[in-house]
Amino acid sequence: MAVIYNWFNDRLEIQAVADDITAKYVPPHVNLFYCLGGITLTCFLIQVATGFALTFYYRPTVGEALSSVRSIMLDTNFGWLIRSVHRWCASMMVLMMVLHVFRVYLTGGFKNPRESTWVTGVIMASCTVSFGVTGYSLPWDQVGYWAVKIVTGVPEAIPVIGPAIVQLLRGNSSVGQATLTRFYSLHTFVLPLLTAVFMLGHFLMIRKQGISGPL
C-alpha cells in the first residue's frame, strides 16, 4: 500500500492537500450551530443518492406517475425505505437550511468580505425551496396536481409578462403532461446541477476566507 500511496503522492501531492485540510484554523467561538451548513450538505447528498435510485422506477407521465410511486412503495425491494428517506430528508434539508441562514444572519456572516458567500447561499436556498415545489408534484396525485396548478398560476398576476411566465412553467395553457415533464427535468437535472455548482463556489469561498469571527 505504501508503494501505491507514494506513487500517487509523487504525482498529485496528496499529503500536501491533506495537511492543508487538517491544519486549517478553526476559531474558538465555533459551536454546534456552525455545523448546520454541513448537515444541509449531508442531506443534499442523501437526496441525490436516494433520488437517483428512485429514477430507475419512477415514470414521469400523467398516466403512470402515481402507479409507479405505488409500485415503488409496495412492490420494489426497499422502495418504501428509499422513498421515505428521500421524503423525510427533504424536510430535514429545508429545516437545516433555514436554521443555517438564521445562524449566518444573526452572527453577521454575510458582511464584508463575505457578501459573495451570502449571495451563493441565498441562491442555494432558493434552489432548495424549488426542489420542494417540483418534487411535491411528481407523484401526480390530487395534492400534487392542485399544488402545481396554484403555484404555476401565481405569476399570472404580474403585469405584461405574467401570462408568458405561466405558459413557460406549464408548457401549455393548462396543467398537464408538459408541466410534469418540466417539473421532473427541473427536479432531477437542472436544480441539482445548479445547486452543485453554487455549492462548490460557496465552499471554495469559505475555504479561502475562513469562518467569520464572533460579533
Curated annotation (Swiss-Prot):
Entry-linked Pfam families = Cytochrome_B (PF00033)
Q: Which residues cross the membrane?
A: 32-52, 90-110, 116-136, 186-206
Q: Which UniProt keywords apply?
A: Chloroplast, Electron transport, Heme, Iron, Membrane, Metal-binding, Photosynthesis, Plastid, Thylakoid, Transmembrane, Transmembrane helix, Transport
Annotated residues for binding of heme c: 35
Q: Which InterPro entries match?
A: Cyt_b/b6_N, Cyt_B6_PetB, Cytb/b6-like_sf, Cytochrome_b_N_euk/bac, Di-haem_cyt_TM
Question: Any note on cofactor binding?
Answer: Binds 2 heme b groups non-covalently with two histidine residues as axial ligands. Binds one heme group covalently by a single cysteine link with no axial amino acid ligand. This heme was named heme ci.
Q: Which residues bind heme b 2?
A: 86, 187
* GO cellular component entries: chloroplast thylakoid membrane
Membrane topology summary: Multi-pass membrane protein
Protein location: Plastid, Chloroplast thylakoid membrane
Q: Set out the biological process GO terms recorded for this chain's protein.
A: photosynthesis; respiratory electron transport chain
**Record keyword Heme present:** yes
Cofactors, names only? heme b; heme c
Record-annotated residues binding heme b 1?
100, 202
Example of a GO MF term: electron transporter, transferring electrons within cytochrome b6/f complex of photosystem II activity
Cite the SUPFAM superfamilies for this sequence: Transmembrane di-heme cytochromes (SSF81342)
| Role played | Component of the cytochrome b6-f complex, which mediates electron transfer between photosystem II (PSII) and photosystem I (PSI), cyclic electron flow around PSI, and state transitions.
Protein family membership: Belongs to the cytochrome b family. PetB subfamily.
Q: Which HAMAP family match?
A: Cytb6_f_cytb6
Complexes and interactors: The 4 large subunits of the cytochrome b6-f complex are cytochrome b6, subunit IV (17 kDa polypeptide, PetD), cytochrome f and the Rieske protein, while the 4 small subunits are PetG, PetL, PetM and PetN. The complex functions as a dimer.
Print the miscellaneous field. Answer: Heme 1 (or BH or b566) is high-potential and absorbs at about 566 nm, and heme 2 (or BL or b562) is low-potential and absorbs at about 562 nm.
Q: Which NCBIfam families match?
A: PRK03735.1
Protein name per the record: Cytochrome b6
Organism in which the protein naturally occurs: Bigelowiella natans
This chain is encoded by the gene named petB-A
